[in-house]
């Protein structure tokens, strides 16, 4: 039977979304590995800022340029290792138990209200999290990203579809930065 195969890139919306989710999983895994999961209470992707994500970290860790360089180095190593990103479909109750065990109370609460009996969980080298939507098959595809200190948190930037798969230049939003300090 004949068919057409179309390659999807970060220049397209669906490819860009899969890349964004996958690089976020990679970043989370790197933070937990570098800092030690016992030192992290929570990493939150707060909102979109400067065409990337503004993230915060709560725990016994201070976000510094040096920490971000260590995290980026670990991310680069995992990209080089081309680790699989594995999707598992599991019962919602099991997902709740896993998030409880992994100290993710927000996700534990989220799934306690879920009506569907099954949920998709993604894992990367032993680290599990929930993402809505498709992921890339492995870390080897995640070669383009930037981490930037943006106190009190940090920014992660990634290729954008509206820029034909390029990472946007950083644009400091001074009014917003001032509101973070207040």
Residues of each region from the PLM?
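Auxiliary tRNA-acceptor-end handling modules of aminoacyl-tRNA synthetases
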Residues: 1-18, 30, 39-50, 54-182
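Short amphipathic alpha-helix segments
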Residues: 23-37
